Design a protein with these regions (language model features):
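Conserved SGNH/GDSL esterase-like catalytic core that processes O-acyl groups on lipids
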Residues: 50-51, 119-122, 165-263, 267, ...
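Positively charged n-region of N-terminal signal peptides that target proteins for export
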Residues: 1-7
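N-terminal secretory targeting modules
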Residues: 7-13, 19-149, 153-174, 362
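Extracellular serine-dependent O-acyl
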Residues: 287-293, 301-338, 344-365
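Surface-exposed acidic, glycine-flexible loop patches that form ligand/cofactor-binding
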Residues: 136-139, 230-239, 278-284, 318-319, ...
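Structural recognition of the beta-strand scaffold that forms the well-ordered cores
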Residues: 145-149, 154, 193-197, 241-246, ...
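A structural motif corresponding to the C-terminal end of an alpha-helix
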Residues: 181-192, 276-288, 315-323
Length: 365
């Protein structure tokens, strides 16, 4: 049974686990969704991409949420209550389960956000309802929007070893996209965001594959689930004011040292990057694009990366239809997360570097 069929089956099971407002049929306006998600029915939703989320306001001190990992393994979400991070929750494989949320003993209105901590490659997380007494959210001011395209660094891979140490469990047990650099800076700037990122993927090849057996970001970007399945295209309804692209770490990687690895091909990297930017413009013609270097690339490799990115930018220099493409260079770091990836502290450093740069661009007329 595939995961969507499983979702539909368990939706029937969870009919009783809805709020009074949902039963009245007016819950459509009471849930807010962000990121790459798939709506099923009755405001049930599959969270797909890293940091994709569902949020709602509720009144009182009683709240439970119904979640399911729709793959045959555990998954994770991160929770934010009233603007404060309250932890990462492990969702074991199996049926829909209820997770209680501890709320202060008052009759105030609260805001809960549920973020997918893992990435698209780890399978979906089904949000199947809440027991809370939902109330309508106050009308929020229209926010600027940003899309962050990237690889494991953008996903938040290996940044949270607070419960399972690095090297233990599965490769996604330390994922926490809530604390990836993109969501951190987005919260700081009070902007809406979507992450379009896949661990291990590059612009023309992957960290250990020469684009022979595995996909690359340009192959999957237009597909909702960020995989080769093009039967469910991404609708691109989210129109970002700024698109950030951080790809190159895996293209420049030496692989695992066992599988054949060819020398880095600057021409392929640059030509693929140019074609990919044209794809981004096709779906978001009014956006401003920023190309990022990698905090995990240094020395001669970083010199090569910067040179290639400048070639890409130069190609679009005479393009009058779109806003100028910018370049941002991270300061190199020695990441302290799992698998030589940034940990949460490193992600905060990356976000702090980007915040003034992105703020200036977003405020430009």
């Amino acid at each position: 049974m595939n995961y969507i069929n499983k979702c539909l089956l368990f939706l029937l099971v969870s009919v009783s686990f809805v709020s009074i407002a949902q039963k009245k049929g007016d819950a459509k306006s009471l849930f807010e969704y962000q990121g790459r998600i798939e709506k099923i029915q009755d405001d049930k939703v599959v969270l797909i991409g890293s940091a994709s989320s569902v949020s709602f306001d509720f009144k009182g001190n009683s709240c439970s949420i119904s979640l399911q990992s729709v793959e045959n393994h555990q998954n994770y979400v991160s929770l934010e209550l009233d603007g404060k991070y309250i932890g990462r929750v492990r969702i074991e494989k199996g049926d829909v389960k209820s997770f209680p949320i501890t709320v202060s003993n008052d009759n105030k209105t609260h805001h809960l956000s549920i973020y997918k901590a893992t990435e698209a490659a780890n399978g979906g997380v089904l949000f199947a309802g809440t027991s809370a007494k939902l109330v309508e959210s106050a009308t929020s001011k229209k926010k600027k929007k940003i899309e962050l395209i990237g690889d494991s660094i953008t996903c938040g891979f290996g940044n949270d070893a607070s419960t399972i140490p690095c090297g233990s469990g599965e490769w996604y047990d330390q994922h926490n996209a809530y604390w990836a650099y993109g969501p951190i800076l987005s919260r700081s700037l009070n902007i809406d965001f979507v992450l379009s990122s896949v661990s291990g993927y590059g612009m023309y090849r992957n960290w250990n594959d020469e684009h022979l057996d595995e996909a690359i970001i340009p192959d999957v970007y237009e597909n909702l689930y960020l995989n080769r399945d093009n039967s469910k295209p991404y609708d691109f309804a989210f129109q970002p004011d700024l698109v950030s692209i951080c790809l190159g770490t895996n293209d420049l990687s030496d692989g695992d040292g066992k599988k054949t690895r060819l020398p880095f091909n600057e021409e392929k990297y640059v030509s693929n990057y140019i074609a990919f930017i044209k794809t981004v413009y096709k779906h978001a013609p009014n956006t401003r694009i920023v190309l990022l270097t990698s905090p995990m690339v240094s020395g001669e490799k970083n010199v090569t990366l910067v040179k290639c990115l400048k070639k890409v930018i130069l190609t679009f220099e005479s393009d009058k239809k779109h806003k100028p493409i910018a370049l941002f260079e991270f300061k190199s770091m020695s990441p302290k997360g799992c698998g030589y990836h940034p940990d949460i502290a490193d992600d905060k450093v990356m976000a702090e570097q980007l915040i003034p740069f992105f703020k200036k661009i977003l405020n430009e007329k």
